[in-house]
Regions:
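N-terminal leader/targeting segments
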Residues: 6-7, 34, 145
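Bacterial N-terminal signal peptides that target proteins for export
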Residues: 4-29
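Short, low-complexity intrinsically disordered segments
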Residues: 13, 21, 36-38, 95
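Bacterial N-terminal signal peptides
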Residues: 28-37
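N-terminal targeting/export leaders
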Residues: 38-157
Length: 157
């Protein structure tokens, strides 16, 4: 018969046969190593771009993260984006623009679309909050957007 409240000396209260102080101190180096290797704050925030009616099947994402120097690292990725020459009217290239609040758009570079209709542009910017949009242009070094916006997004860092 078992009495309640009585201790059983043959039953161990711990699953490890070592004292608690040794067991917990052995965990500290492992926890510290995980903290150094874990990518805290290194993951990118992703924003989905909205397609224009001219390219309804196009998809785009903007991935942003803060770099080591405090600037914003930006990766613009597109899928199923038609070649600019297939648009009406046909154009030569796509240009990615960043527009901070109360400022004019800045040309961040040409977005090249491959034969699989995928595109990517990686760049760095000093902005936290800005609009991202892609236009079809006659040339890549234009100072201001002239072509139609094909994908747009708002980045609120």
């Amino acid at each position: 018969m078992i009495r309640t409240g009585q201790a059983f000396p043959s039953v161990k209260t711990s699953w490890l046969p070592i004292p608690n102080s040794i067991r917990y101190s052995a965990l500290i180096p492992g926890i510290m190593g995980m903290m150094l290797l874990w990518p805290f704050g290194d993951t990118a925030k992703k924003v989905t771009m909205m397609p224009a009616k001219e390219v309804p099947g196009a998809q785009g994402t903007v991935a942003v993260k803060t770099g080591k120097n405090g600037n914003t690292e930006v990766d613009v990725t597109t899928k199923a984006l038609a070649q600019p020459s297939a648009l009406t009217p046909p154009e030569e290239t796509y240009v990615v623009w960043f527009q901070p609040p109360d400022q004019s758009p800045k040309n961040m570079g040409a977005l090249r679309v491959d034969n699989s209709l995928n595109g990517k542009l990686s760049t760095v910017a000093p902005y936290r909050h800005f609009k991202v949009f892609i236009t079809a242009e006659k040339q890549q070094n234009v100072a201001s957007p002239h072509g139609a916006k094909v994908l747009t997004a708002d980045v609120l860092g």
